[in-house]
Amino acid sequence: MKKLILFELRKVFSKRLALIALIGIILFSALLSFSTFQNKYAFDQNIGKGTGKTAVEIDKEIAAKYEGILTDKKVQQMMSDFAPTSDLHGLSAIYVYQNAMQSAAFSRFSDKEGNWNGLSVSDVFGNEEIKIGYVDGWLSTSRNMVRVFVALALAVIIMLAPIFSGEYEGVDNIILTSKYGKTKCATAKVVAGIITAILTTTLIAAFNLLLAFVFYGTEGLDCSILFAPSDYVEAFIPFNITCGTLLKYQILLAFTCTLSVTGITLFLSAISKNQIVALVAAMAIFLFPVLLPITEVNPLFRLVGLLPIYHVLAISLLSVEQMSNGMLYAIWAIPAALLFLGVGAGISRRVLAKPQVS
């Protein structure tokens, strides 16, 4: 069985389209991370301004000045330090960007002229204890991971679509089933598909984390996502979790997504005699839920949000609920993924083990 699984894995990774998809994801990750890093901008009237690496260093230096638990005293200090020194020409100070810390402070505690709006920390965050620091780099990584993991799911579909349906177009199935039996061959394909999804997801997640460590260091992983610059979607998650926790959930959801689409793709590959049909159908099923007129506030989203596409569009699913044990509702993606994988793998194994004769 081990040799048969290795044989199936070699078949998956030796296909030109699969290699192109995998290399494409790696290059896309590198390009996205590098361009995000290079486009960083920060300004401070005492330190100076810069882009790219210089901007990151400026943001880190500013964050170090205020890091720790957010207090009303720190808010007043930031409002004073970052007060506009020139005419805003009608622009609201709430949306003016100087640096990451200034943007986080002004988007919550400033009026449109750049003065304190009268709100306290408890007015904005309730009884939550908000730890602040340099979070810009990790939130950029989180935002990029959404795009990367969507592409990853599509790549897994491309890699696995031919795993069963491709056998109808060749003689491999006849040779292997005569030697090992239909059940063993079907099981080997299912196991190879699961291993492919796990290995590919691990590789891409590790590569993106490595890039983040290289570009931004380790600062800020223990800081809250709630005190983030105004342009981050992560700020819409209404729960006081750290950047590290956010990334852990995202990577977990990347695995649940790829395992879910593995089950779907195995099923479609097994029932289809044409790998192109299996590929298109799997992609359509994966992407279709985003077209449904169901918003995050709709009670039905608690079910729709457990479909694979929303695992990687993580922000919506992570915003649903924080349960009494402190875990987020998104953890239900694990049993959902096991259901997709179990049903898809089970049916596809039966289809190949007992093919219908037309």
Where in this protein do the model-derived segments appear?
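Extracytoplasmic loops/domains of multi-pass membrane proteins
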Residues: 72-110
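Short helix-to-coil transition segments within interhelical loops
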Residues: 176-182
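Transmembrane helix segments
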Residues: 35-36, 272-303
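Secretory targeting signals
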Residues: 24, 28-63, 67, 92, ...
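Alpha-helical transmembrane segments of multi-pass membrane transporters/translocases
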Residues: 2, 18-21, 257-265, 317-358
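Residues that define the loop-to-transmembrane-helix transition and helix capping
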Residues: 16, 183, 275-277
